Amino acid sequence: MEAVKCEAFLAAAELGSLTATAELLGYTQSGVTRMIGTLEEELGFPLFLRSKKGVQLTENGKLMLPLLREVVRAHHNAEQLSAEIGGVSKGSLTIGCYYSISALWMPEILTAFRARYPGVTVRMQEGGNLEMARWLNERSVDCCFGAQMHGDKYDWLPVFRDELVAWLPHRHELAEADAFPLTRLQDEPFIHTSPNHDTDQDRLLEQHDLHPQTCFTTRDGFTTYNMVEAGLGVSFNQRLISRKWSGTVAEVPFDPPQFVTLGISVPSLKEASPAAKKFIACAIETVTGGEKGL
């Protein structure tokens, strides 16, 4: 079973189109069709339902998805290790990360990593905790940057401790206060970012059994920030997220203080590819300035 056929299968499963798969992998559509057809012959059953709208996994295809993903992962690991033994670093990585981390940390991390290992290509996927937990479980990513996932299924490397702060309109009576009482979140019109998605907001509210009066919900922190600036309510987030934003929103520490630890989750550090281990080391060094992190 050739890894290239499995890669074509994985791409088609993700994209739902043989044409898009061919464009992504640099083959002709007929070439992709032949590869997947040959793979189906080897396995003895169809992997896709085909229609004019594209392709969709059969039930057997869904069962084979994680197994063929492992075939591709093992192949890439073998390629990377053999290249490393020969003195050359190459390979490909898929990295999941918070939207805030992708905007603030990843440009510097990717610049440093590409300078050291130009032969390794990196693909980045942005998402929240729920999406990243799914990607880790599917092993469709090599690692994820964000808060620690629930449970102990993944290896976790803490890197950075950030403070959660209240976001208040600049005319709010506590905008210049030393602290914002945590329980007061229940007494203010609240703007909730991505509710019910296991976000840092969801976790803090659940941990302290707080039930704010939600007046608006948004999909991202930047929208929330601008709505707070307009005086439509209050919210909270990490200090990190608004570091490069310009605005009049007051960022006030909570009483009692609240923190979140950001780090790197890996399906298995022991089984991580050589390129993934190099990327993780480079990322930690870049974020911490050469320190070992928390």
Predicted features along the sequence, with ranges:
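Flexible hinge/capping segments at coil-to-helix
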Residues: 86, 153-164, 168-190
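Central regulatory/effector-binding core of bacterial HTH transcription factors
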Residues: 90-152, 217-218
